[in-house]
Amino acid sequence: MSDITKEQVVEFIAGMTVLELSEFIKELEEKFGVSAAAPVAAMAAAPAEAAAPAEEEKTEFDVILKSPGANKIAVIKVVRALTGLGLKEAKEKVDGTPSTLKEAVSKDDAEEAAKQLKEAGAEVEVK
């Protein structure tokens, strides 16, 4: 095995676009015969009693771009910074509103993302 460290692999993956990362995950699934969606299926099969306490405080939030507002270019820049998408992908997200920009993030991260988008002139919803 070569002298590549785990940190170098993590840094390389962190520099990938969402599209590149998606393709990378598909290749890994094919190579090793696994599915990244398997844990989700296991959670869906859990007993309904475990999901009963619906009054629990929500810990994961989604940031949804409702409208880019008047300053679309500034919103695209913020979307790129928040998501790591390329220019084309970020523009498609902004043009295709409403669109989910971040999923299952902490409350602080969701509020910070919403704040940045609102400052750029976008209409944002945090669910």
Curated annotation (Swiss-Prot):
GO biological process: translation
Keyword Isomerase recorded: no
Keyword annotations of the record: Ribonucleoprotein, Ribosomal protein
Transmembrane segments: none
Gene3D superfamilies linked: 3.30.1390.10, Single helix bin
Molecular function as annotated in GO: mRNA binding; structural constituent of ribosome
Disulfide bond entries: none
GO cellular component: cytosolic large ribosomal subunit
Biased composition annotated in UniProt, kind: Basic and acidic residues: 104-127
Region (Disordered) residue spans: 96-127
Role according to the record: Forms part of the ribosomal stalk which helps the ribosome interact with GTP-bound translation factors. Is thus essential for accurate translation.
HAMAP family in the record: Ribosomal_bL12
Subunit structure: Homodimer. Part of the ribosomal stalk of the 50S ribosomal subunit. Forms a multimeric L10(L12)X complex, where L10 forms an elongated spine to which 2 to 4 L12 dimers bind in a sequential fashion. Binds GTP-bound translation factors.
Family: Belongs to the bacterial ribosomal protein bL12 family.
Protein name, entry field: Large ribosomal subunit protein bL12
Species classification: Bacteria, Pseudomonadati, Thermodesulfobacteriota, Desulfovibrionia, Desulfovibrionales
